[in-house]
Amino acid sequence: MNNTKQPVVILVGPTAVGKTNLSIQLAKSLNAEIISGDSMQIYKGMDIGTAKITEQEMEGVPHHLIDILDPQDSFSTADYQSLVRNKISEIANRGKLPMIVGGTGLYIQSVLYDYTFTEEANDPVFRESMQMAAEREGADFLHAKLAAADPEAAAAIHPNNTRRVIRALEILHTSGKTMSQHLKEQKRELLYNAVLIGLTMDRDTLYERINQRVDLMMQSGLLPEVKRLYDKNVRDCQSIQAIGYKELYAYFDGFVTLSDAVEQLKQNSRRYAKRQLTWFRNKMQVTWFDMTPPVDMELKKKEIFTHIAGKLEL
């Protein structure tokens, strides 16, 4: 192959498909260090709702970009791109293989491709008007507005993530071009010798796993975790737009019952999983591996390892 670019492994897939466990086993086999590809695991104190890996689950494998910000801090795709590219260099300099694991498609895409962010498309007045519209009409109203104007961007952004929805609308408003057009107009050259692995699963099985995961989160203390943030008056922040937090904030605000909030959380998680799969299938050259039970995990791990080793000529 004689590819002189830095090798990077990327493991993607929808929430609850089993990325965490497999990533640890692969990292050990590949002598890799893991970089989080999840937009919400960067926040401290948001562990249960983001299904953040525990130190015990890491089994000694170094992890990066987890617990680096307070919930009040903002964090952009450009910030992620810069941090991860630096981490990739650091890991490679240690003689290790960088591995990105997560499900935030736009974040991962921004790292892999020669994509630069522009600050030109800024209109604070428009942004403020959209924020007021979100507060008045609700997040779904704004997301529907984006879906009508830029379906591709809407598919990649969760309705709860008002900040990113407004940013996509702002780009359209100021430049006359969709976020998708901006991406397409830029060079789409891969900056790395990247092997993209995707985990998928039968939809009914995946949805059942998502429902079970939410139940387990509630049993593990998600409600008090969110209450701690609520009591600290952490509001109007990017972090609280995460699935699992916004739904329970509505409960603490007295707008919905707890059972309705949990049901909404399950529904939003299932919809997000569907959008994740759509994004990765349409936007990136991913090799997919089916994880639908019953599956021999040891055999599946060997199959994926062999694929990676072949691509990177290990």
Curated annotation (Swiss-Prot):
Keywords: ATP-binding, Magnesium, Nucleotide-binding, Transferase, tRNA processing
Keyword Cell division: no
Positions contributing to ATP binding: G13, P14, T15, A16, V17, G18, K19, T20
An example Gene Ontology biological process: tRNA modification
InterPro entries noted in UniProt: Dimethylallyltransferase, IPT, P-loop_NTPase
Domain of life according to the entry: Bacteria
Interaction with substrate tRNA as annotated region, ranges: 38-41
Cofactor(s) needed: Mg(2+)
Gene Ontology molecular function: any one: tRNA dimethylallyltransferase activity
Presence of the UniProt keyword Chloroplast in the record: no
Pfam families, A to Z: IPPT
Physiological role: Catalyzes the transfer of a dimethylallyl group onto the adenine at position 37 in tRNAs that read codons beginning with uridine, leading to the formation of N6-(dimethylallyl)adenosine (i(6)A).
Protein name: tRNA dimethylallyltransferase
